[in-house]
Amino acid sequence: MKDGKMTALAISSTALGFVLLATHATGVGVALDKVRAAAFGHAPQDQQQQVMLEQTFPVGAGGTLVIDVRDADVRVTTAAGGQSSVTVLAEARDQDWARQVFERMRFEVGVSGTTLTVRAHDPDIRSEEWREHRGVSMTVRVAIPNRFDVRITTADGDVEVGDIEGAVQLRTSDGDVQLGNVTGSASVTTSDGDVTAGDITGGVEFRTSDGDVHVGVVSGPAIVLQSSDGDIDAGTLAAEKITVRTQDGDIVLASVAGELDAAVGDGDVTVRFAKAAPASITAGDGDIAVSADGAFGFDLDLSGGDVSVPRGMVVQGTVSSRGARGTVNGGGPLIRVRSGDGSVVVNLPGAR
């Protein structure tokens, strides 16, 4: 048996060598495809996609979409119209195996009133089955009118939702989430993945345990952006209460209008205020930079490894290389900044 393994290895190595020698003649892309084929026994084009389910329903604007699938990617598109449709696609090398997996998932698709529901169960595939047949990728595609509420839950898969007017709730245990522009509230939770969204009106709660958070212009009564391990960057944030936290990553907030509570364990923080509002900004080990769009009045309480304010910025109080406390432009909401081992730079334009 050992000799057989060595012979197979020699054949694979020889095939791999011929593929690499062919690189100059056939191009890098073709050679890489052949390398994959030699290493794994199939080429990328062996993957085939087939439609497993396709249905259309008379559910127009103002409805609700509920999706609960165990192991599949979810893609939701929106457009003007009075109908909704559901398509389930399977991508695999073995089409018979793909059909078996689909049947094991026991998809349930139906309408009750104005609620369109898509549910699927865990296919319960054993490890030896995966080794024999290789993987199967399931995708649930749903098309709905622009004005719709959306609730999606998946245990393992990416989630994409286009522009929509309505409340959005997205949950995935393992996958990235992409969300378009939303007129309504948006709540997103993923245990392992990035969260990316456009402009949102209605409030936001985005949480990821391991991934970055990227948002555009967001407004509403409250905004929460949180990551345990990842960067957070946002365009304009406008709310009564804004909470931004990450344990390991940078925070960049281009424009803030509202009470801010920002904290990072290990990373830098950059904040620009669009109006005067209370703020607490903390970095365990990182630099903090604070600026403002105008000559707003603030109370300052700054502390860090190296604290600095620009020349000409008048602070009524005390300023040293380790901290500053006082008022700017007659005083106003308190900006409290703390960095355990990093620089703190505050630059308030017009505060001269």
Regions found by a protein language model. Give the residues of each.
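Intrinsically disordered, low-complexity terminal regions
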Residues: 1-352
